[in-house]
């Protein structure tokens, strides 16, 4: 039995959805612990593409319980659209459960999110405009609406009316936007409540019952380490904690429950929105990575910025999360390159630096120090074992493992489930990896 956390080791979009989908086959329960519809993950099964935002990837396995935890923020309209999409694809949501204490995104959250981002001008942080930040802000301000309020609208209607009137003042006076009609909003959300009611539970208790029953539990992270509100590239971050520690808080369990942490990283680096990005490529190679890697956001459709693998932020993610092993994704995107660069350190104002600087202004001045490696110039998407990989690709993986001091357990070579090299099931198998801590193949 093992309880496993899957987190993003970069700026999100690392391929966590595919890795979680692979591991969900061996999991009894999959828990989404933070974030909202600002996150997006794509899973491809037998040529069919599933794009999910709030619902855990484990929903594609009919016997797997999927829990949306209390650390998330829920837009009921989008969630119901997602449920409807799954039903049209003949996927059951009978095993989907929603935390009664998760906070609810309201129409005014989306309006304020968009208006405040516009007001920032050239100081934009790259929000998705989905109302996530304002929802978390109300949670911290203790004026938020929770799912349990939504389920008890007859008794909590005064709370809804007060919140809408309060936000109307902000919409009108600060952003010059028309006010919302409280009764219209309440009736809209009453319909959402009726549709979601069968799924609402005490999520912390449900997870705890799974732990006591010795079930395999998979905690699915959203976004990535460098987007963490406390440990990321602030202020260009999300409003929650996508790191491994955040899984405990968002799921309502203690840290001793967690057995291992898997970090997911692309074989290169991407970032969406604003903020410093030392290895960003504005040339034809950056364009190639974006084109071959189909680097467009699942949630926003925005083009992702692309660059070389950054081992400095990789080491930082390993430290912050206590990574046990890595899943490296999209190795196949590098197949056509003559040479591949890896950022091994930074230069800041003429001084070498091997550690991630928390100061955003300092980080913006970082110049990458690269190690150049030969490319392999042959396709890898059909490889199913380490022995089938070109020696240059294996050397590249070995180098990444050495730089991060974390073994590589999974190598993904495409979007499909079958396009994966894996030796041991990270949930049921022993704590070993495809590459050991010295980067040597296990065989």
Curated annotation (Swiss-Prot):
Keywords: Cytoplasm, GTP-binding, Ligase, Magnesium, Metal-binding, Nucleotide-binding, Purine biosynthesis
Pathway membership: Purine metabolism; AMP biosynthesis via de novo pathway; AMP from IMP: step 1/2
Residues the record marks as active site: 13, 41
One Pfam family here: Adenylsucc_synt
SMART domains, alphabetized: Adenylsucc_synt
Cellular location(s): Cytoplasm
Name of the protein this chain belongs to: Adenylosuccinate synthetase
Cofactor: Mg(2+)
Positions annotated to bind GTP: 12-18, 40-42, 304, 330-332, 412-414
GO terms of biological process kind: 'de novo' AMP biosynthetic process; IMP metabolic process
Catalysis performed (reactions): IMP + L-aspartate + GTP = N(6)-(1,2-dicarboxyethyl)-AMP + GDP + phosphate + 2 H(+)
The UniProt record lists the keyword Magnesium: yes
EC category name: ligase
Enzyme Commission code: 6.3.4.4
Sequence positions that bind Mg(2+): 13, 40
Annotated GO MF terms: adenylosuccinate synthase activity; GTP binding; magnesium ion binding
Gene3D superfamilies: Adenylosuccinate Synthetase, subunit A, domain 1 (3.40.440.10), Adenylosuccinate Synthetase, subunit A, domain 2 (1.10.300.10), Adenylosuccinate Synthetase, subunit A, domain 3 (3.90.170.10)
InterPro entries membership: Adenylosuccin_syn_GTP-bd (IPR018220), Adenylosuccin_syn_Lys_AS (IPR033128), Adenylosuccinate_synth_dom1 (IPR042109), Adenylosuccinate_synth_dom2 (IPR042110), Adenylosuccinate_synth_dom3 (IPR042111), Adenylosuccinate_synthetase (IPR001114), P-loop_NTPase (IPR027417)
Keyword Cytoplasm part of the UniProt annotation: yes
Residues bound to substrate: 298-304
